[in-house]
């Protein structure tokens, strides 16, 4: 579909021509892009090496698909593609969203009595300085007694925290969100009509394991807490509720595992498991589609409509002019986009394909990231005067000794 001009620039300078752009955006992970630029845009004719293009490596790329739909990324790879066909030789630029700034190597760090918000903000500031816009507003606001970043990159650690506490995590093209955006329900809804700007459309449901059980041990009070999820998930549409019921019958036993985070009471553990259940069911009802609307991006709220021609007899009954073609519109549902791929060409062609979930789900699907596995480590005991008289100690691991860090009270 021919759309308004797509603007593409590098290091704050607009590039006059491009051959094609492909941008893949998904919640919980880095976005990726591939841009083809004619060889002649920056290199001399008959140049068989890079004389200028290599200077783009590590630079910020800006793609403006529409006035309010921008993408900022980092170029991490450049190739010269020599070709004798009608397209000619190309410079191929590939890279990631600016979240890639948080992948500068695995790290080890620890925090005591700190909120999730403060931890994530500190990690982003340390890894990306002021280069990555962010909005960090997690629902979990309690102080956390002790938390460790353990042989994880900054982004892997943020992914793991999002999974551990079932917080929203996504990059909207310009800003990284950790926690559900406060104005998500007030966002402008974008209407898409099947047969107009919505080219193909699939609606699906899938059975999911929905019943979770967990236990934790509170060593301060020598008490074991054990809970399991209930048979209700909020925020699902009719199809989601029916999918939940079918899933319960299919997977009719409850899992049991050690709680992902330490809790002080059963009510707290129940809340955490409820959010995990919401995350599991978030994509049980979904849609996939292709569209020509270049306003769409991760986090967009869309309303899907189906437009049908009204038969002549029905037009008469409705008091419509039967000599004209009349249409009626039926609303299919309201959704939030969680995956989208944009494709554009230099002649103004544009199309996207996307996946979307029911708009009012409470929690996004979990990030697919593994929890770190701890190993035996050497440590120095720095305190054995347990204020609660329970025989606990504090230690410094070797990696904590240069950072003035320490563990919590441990046995």
Show which residues each predicted segment covers.
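Amphipathic alpha-helical and helix-coil boundary elements used as assembly
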Residues: 1-411
């Amino acid at each position: 579909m021919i759309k308004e001009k797509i603007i593409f620039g590098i290091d704050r300078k607009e590039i006059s021509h491009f051959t094609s752009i492909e941008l893949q955006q998904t919640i919980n992970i880095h976005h990726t892009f591939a841009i083809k630029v004619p060889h002649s845009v920056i290199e001399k004719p008959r140049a068989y090496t890079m004389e200028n293009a290599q200077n783009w490596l590590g630079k910020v790329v800006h793609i403006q698909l529409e006035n309010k739909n921008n993408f900022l990324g980092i170029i991490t790879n450049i190739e010269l593609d020599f070709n004798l066909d009608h397209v000619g030789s190309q410079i191929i630029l590939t890279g990631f969203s600016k979240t890639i700034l948080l992948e500068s190597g695995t790290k080890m760090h620890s925090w005591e009595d700190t909120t999730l918000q403060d931890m994530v903000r500190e990690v982003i500031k340390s890894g990306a300085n002021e280069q990555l816009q962010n909005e960090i507003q997690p629902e979990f606001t309690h102080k956390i007694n002790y938390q460790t970043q353990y042989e994880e990159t900054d982004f892997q650690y943020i992914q793991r925290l999002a999974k551990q506490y079932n917080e929203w995590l996504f990059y909207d093209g310009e800003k990284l969100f950790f926690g559900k955006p406060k104005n998500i329900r007030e966002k402008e809804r974008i209407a898409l009509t099947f047969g107009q700007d919505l080219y193909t459309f699939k609606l699906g449901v899938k059975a999911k394991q929905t019943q979770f059980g967990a236990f934790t041990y509170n060593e301060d009070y020598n008490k074991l807490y054990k809970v399991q999820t209930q048979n209700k998930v909020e925020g699902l549409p009719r199809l989601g509720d029916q999918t939940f019921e079918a899933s319960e019958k299919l997977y009719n036993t409850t899992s049991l595992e050690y709680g992902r985070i330490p809790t002080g009471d059963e009510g707290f553990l129940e809340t955490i498991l409820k959010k995990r259940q919401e995350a599991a069911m978030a994509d049980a009802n979904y849609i996939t589609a292709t569209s020509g609307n270049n306003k769409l991006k991760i986090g967009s709220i869309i309303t899907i409509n189906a437009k049908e021609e009204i038969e002549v007899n029905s037009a008469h009954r409705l008091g419509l002019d039967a000599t004209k073609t009349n249409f009626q519109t039926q609303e299919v549902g309201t959704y939030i986009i969680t995956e989208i791929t944009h494709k554009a060409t230099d002649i103004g062609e544009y199309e996207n394909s996307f996946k979307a979930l029911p708009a009012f789900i409470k929690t996004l699907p979990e990030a697919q990231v593994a929890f770190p596995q701890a190993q035996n480590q050497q440590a120095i005991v720095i305190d054995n005067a347990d204020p609660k008289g329970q025989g606990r100690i504090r230690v410094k691991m070797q990696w904590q000794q240069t950072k003035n860090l320490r563990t919590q009270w441990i046995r």
